[in-house]
């Protein structure tokens, strides 16, 4: 058996589990993952240690939690055990991919491992001299690399995970995260943790109260400088008659798996 490296484990989005803690938390990047991780660590008395280890809370998850001997095996046993309640935090797929796009614009253009791939993709389409990337182009890029089996980035992959989703007892929509986690605590006899103080993260890109993006925002090539100068647009501005069908096609598996919570019309109205 090939031994997984730390980077490989990090990319797997393994659930959060602790022996003796009654909840297994399944999650996806760009779906409240930092808040859920903090909630989990607080319940297990590890949050202070994790924040001391690194300002970026996921470093503790990657370097410490996922590196524990037998951790993946524990995950696989736990999701099949009646001793654990398995929850998964999910997010409207349209809102999530907008968040991924804004995150790319804000912080990932320089360090993102896909930057060279995106640059090549643009050059092949005669866009090599274009500065930045529009939301429409971002969705086209995701579609194209997915067709070639190269959609490596968990921020861009669908949320549905065949390894874990079939074992989930309850879906917790990010839009109702506080209530969903409180209900989990009630059912499992856990003390209440107020997530309000845990929800702030440096990688959130909240919409500006006032922005100056053009009406046809989804076709507008943007960079981090655009966010500084024009503000952060609301998701509803980027989700239009062109991009909504693209999102629906790319993340159809999520819409089918989480149809109880998310429909196309809701995605557009958000």
Locations of regions flagged by a protein language model:
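Membrane-interface amphipathic segments in extracytoplasmic regions
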Residues: 1-270
